[in-house]
Amino acid sequence: MSELDNVLRLPAEQMYAHEIEVLISAETERIPTGWKMSPRSVLTYITGGKVKGVEISPKYIGNRRLVEVAISTLLTDRALLLIGEPGTAKSWLSEHLSAAIHGDSTKVIQGTAGTTEEQIRYSWNYAMLIANGPSREALVKSPIFRAMECGGIARFEEISRCASEVQDALISILSEKRISIPELGYEIPAAKGFSIIATANTRDRGVNDMSSALKRRFNIIVLPTPGDIETEIEIVRKRVKELAVNLELQAALPADDAIVKVVTIFRELRNGMTLDSKEKIKPPSGVISTAEAISLLTNSMALAACFGKGKITSEDIAAGLQGAIVKDEEKDKLVWREYLDNVLKKRGSEWRDLYNACKEMNA
């Protein structure tokens, strides 16, 4: 077993290294400065296709035009902001754009309430600072600093979770394309190819509004939830299969019927309406995302492998549904019970096992 085989999750540029190598070797178009491949090849990497007889798997299943706008934005001097509800593949798309364009998706700042301006610009190795005073050797460079030096892409995840004054530290970086270090009396200009891809949630707790001045420095793309149930089912099926292989889950992949049921329940609760639009549904307090449907089915496989017979049952799915939907014990338990009694119970016999398992979990 190689060292990489023992890693729980590889960065995109390593996980899909063969596809990236094929696209680079087959390149016939002009490659922008600082990029590994042409914009058209980046699009093929993200949306899928066939190159030199090699199948390039789609990384993002959705509106192709949005991906084209994202790629073209990174050709300009504008940064890119991907916004949307939780689970709309913002981080996933950000990672794969960075991997395809620069070959490195690991220059990441994770935005939190505790993120400081030093984590955006630079900080110091204080032992060296005290011993020798300010020097380049004592400088601790942020991911954005390192991306500016090499002309790469820095990723800023959950930017809206940072305090507003910390967010605004980006304004001068995005405007001037340089970081000043007054302690050393010099500044670092951004090399060609440098850009920032930020992500932000539109519907979540614990977020801070971005200032208009900061928003003006970004090209903003809103990533929607999957437009139809067929697309969402395809996304869930593909990701569950990939995760099952990566995690070496010793259980059969979920049947199409199980995926359809989970996605149907999630879409109806998310939209507050049954799929046939005949009955309104009270939505739960939390966000019911595609990412959670993927996580639910993956966990159901783990349950089936460890404590079942290697095949997902209604009881495995019911356990996952309970945890995914009932996030607020007081409000969501009632919402879930009403959905079971008013919607799921009235469906045909093929839903009966899942209904009974869910009722038992929600007792």
Language-model features: locations:
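Short, residue-level hotspots on alpha-helical faces of the histone-fold
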Residues: S172, E176, T298-A302, G323
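C-terminal engagement/docking regions of AAA+ P-loop ATPases
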Residues: A305-A363
